[in-house]
Amino acid sequence: MTGNRRLAAALLAVLVCALTTTSPVGAITAPDWSGLDARDYAGPIPSAGDVIAAVPLNPALSVRGAGEAFRILYATVDQHAEPAVSTAAVFTPRTAPPPGGWPVVAWAHGTVGLGDDCTPSALPRSARDDEYLTHWLDQGYVVVGTDYAGLGTPGLMSYLNSTAEAHSVVDSVRAVHHLDLPLSPKWAIIGQSQGGGAAVNSAWWADRLTAGAGLDYRGVVATGTPANIERVFARAGPDLPPRQTPPAAISYTSYILAALREAHPELGIDKVLTPRGRELADAAQSLCKPALDQRVGTTTLNDLFSAPVGSLPGIDAALDSFMGTPTEGYSRPIFLGQGLLDSDVPPLSTQTLYQQLTDNHQDVELHIYPDQDHSGTVIASMPDSTRFLQRVMAG
């Protein structure tokens, strides 16, 4: 049992560190809403995928490869299966659209925090993400990057909620097709790390949520993709060895706790949390990641829990529905990229997901980058993922 607990602690610490995608921009920047502040939006909500408002994005928040850039407010569905709104950034290529229009890629962002001040479309992009998104613009794709419902809009962003994130991603694609842009019906999904998980889940929902919309979903690119986190998280508790854990791991755990507690109040998550655990889960609702990392200090994983997470009735089913990733039922090809030097998402995590998908006869390919770490895989994978998208778009 002691060995298993040590393994659970190690896996939890490593896997929760996997959930970051965007490199820190640096000093905390006040959000710029580009004239579209939807934090307290209380107007009517139309059908999912409909655009409510669209404005030019402040050029300071654009990426260097964009021709035009917009910030949009659109309708979607939240973690409670209720109508909700989300915002997104939209970037168009500098080149003229081809016959039939530009295809679209939906970008699933990584961990920034749950507070409105963390909203990606209201902040400058990191250098890495600027390079990555510019690459796809240079390839002739329109890029739409959702913020996810609750981030810069009413409600709490449901962190790692597979279905809620999928709705935000897929509905952003439906929304961009309501803009006055020359678009092809073909579209794909791209994402890294926590956003890679969101991308794969969005791929499962893609055709299901766009049936009858005239769209043509073609495939997904996901790098550094965590999988099966729900199984590891269920083993968290006070009996984990009191090892020093990077603050980021505690921050990600706190984000999970805050989101799970909000989505499933019937579980009584607070019953297995210490006062310190409740304090950090509360703080996670508003603090962006750099600030939450500072608040964490020297807290360890076992400091958060007064009882095992697995002792909560119904927790396994709730975790599976909340953050589980389907391993069958995908309609289009899947690209998984993984760096062997990745210390955030262990290669075994992506390899396990690949094996699960392969066992279920899904169309999936795994690309390994021996000399790349977690973040480096994003850029290193571009030649392979570019060829992948060219192939599936042409199919």
Region locations from a protein language model:
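Accessory cap/linker subdomain of secreted extracellular hydrolases
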Residues: 34-37, 43, 59, 223-325
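Short alpha-helix in the alpha/beta-hydrolase fold that links the catalytic acid
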Residues: 202, 332-334, 346-356
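Catalytic-loop region of hydrolases
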Residues: 26-97
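Alpha/beta-hydrolase active-site loop
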Residues: 159-180
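Short, surface-exposed "cap/lid" segments of acyl-processing enzymes
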Residues: 79-87, 91-139, 152
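Short beta-strand/loop motif that positions the catalytic acidic residue
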Residues: 330, 335-342
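C-terminal catalytic histidine-bearing segment of alpha/beta-hydrolase fold enzymes
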Residues: 308-318, 344, 351-395
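Primarily recognizes the serine-hydrolase "nucleophile elbow" in alpha/beta-hydrolase
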Residues: 174-246
